[in-house]
């Protein structure tokens, strides 16, 4: 019997040593992702639709695209907050600052937190300032971008240091909920993030699949004490930024942030074994399809578009 280790086995070896994900990122699971005709077909449709959106964007012009994206984000706020935000298509940074400076209001705090995340994605993608981490410490830099404008309760919390305590995901507040998932042990975080970087650079997987699987793996690792959701979604948006464009990326942020319960349900199906990576990718790519449909609606305001 041959004892030669294949390239595929070598790429998967690290993942199979990761507690909590060894059942997900197996050689067989990654092979199924590569060979899934339904995923390949769905991605081909996504890219074709994106090309049509790009054609409309070019006719619309960058400033008008900025204006339309900002208006889309403003409309996510409640009416009182929306009236306080001015559209500044020439200055995405000023727009983000205005969203972050909305005065504290406990009744709209959760909605504002979600809209701040979308506004951050908009500002970074509009400025071409969002890229994938190049090393493990790059995840800390990504955290800083993902948490820009979020309240800091003290000098120590929240911050971009990797957590040094055990963490779990629960289905309700502490002492009232059930444990859904035990996150990676603190001692494993550096090694597992390095393995995540390997996944994100695996050219045998389509970029969209790398982006979505990278998000799932990041959620399993949960390397920070706070802001993991913001950072994980930002990571996925960064990975998609090489193939998709501002309106789609902003609308995808809306889909995954405003409808994050749906994404969470997909993660739970992975946890329980009721779904596999193919199912997870298909579900998240369906959200990307929805984002493209919303982007098309936004761009129609500047002219007619057919998809």
Where are these regions (language model features)?
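FIC/Doc superfamily catalytic core
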Residues: 1-307
């Amino acid at each position: 019997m041959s004892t030669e280790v294949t390239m595929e086995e070598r790429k998967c070896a690290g993942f199979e040593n990761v507690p909590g994900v060894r059942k997900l990122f197996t050689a067989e699971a990654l092979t199924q992702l590569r060979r899934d005709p339904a995923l390949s077909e769905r991605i081909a449709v996504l890219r074709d639709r994106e090309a049509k959106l790009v054609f409309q964007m070019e006719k619309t012009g960058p400033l008008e695209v900025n204006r339309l994206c900002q208006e889309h984000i403003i409309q996510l706020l409640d009416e009182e907050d929306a009236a306080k935000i001015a559209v500044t298509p020439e200055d995405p940074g000023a727009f983000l600052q205005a969203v972050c400076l909305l005065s504290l209001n406990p009744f709209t705090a959760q909605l504002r937190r979600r809209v701040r995340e979308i506004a951050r994605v908009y500002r970074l993608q509009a400025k071409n300032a969002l890229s994938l981490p190049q090393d493990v410490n790059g995840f800390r830099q990504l955290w800083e971008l993902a948490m820009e404008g979020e309240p800091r309760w003290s000098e120590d919390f929240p911050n971009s240091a990797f957590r040094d305590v055990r963490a779990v995901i629960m289905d309700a507040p502490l002492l009232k909920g059930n444990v859904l998932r035990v996150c990676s042990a603190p001692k494993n975080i550096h090694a597992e993030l390095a393995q995540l970087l390997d996944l994100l650079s695996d050219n045998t997987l389509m970029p969209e699949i790398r982006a979505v699987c990278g998000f799932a793996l990041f959620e399993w690792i949960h390397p920070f004490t706070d802001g993991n959701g913001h950072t994980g979604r930002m990571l996925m948006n960064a990975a998609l930024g090489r193939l998709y464009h501002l309106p789609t990326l902003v609308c995808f942020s809306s889909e995954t942030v405003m409808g994050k319960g749906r994404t969470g349900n997909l993660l739970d199906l992975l946890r329980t074994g009721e779904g596999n990576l193919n199912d997870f990718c298909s579900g998240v790519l369906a959200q990307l399809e929805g984002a493209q449909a919303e982007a098309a609606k936004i761009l129609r305001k500047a002219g007619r578009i057919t998809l």
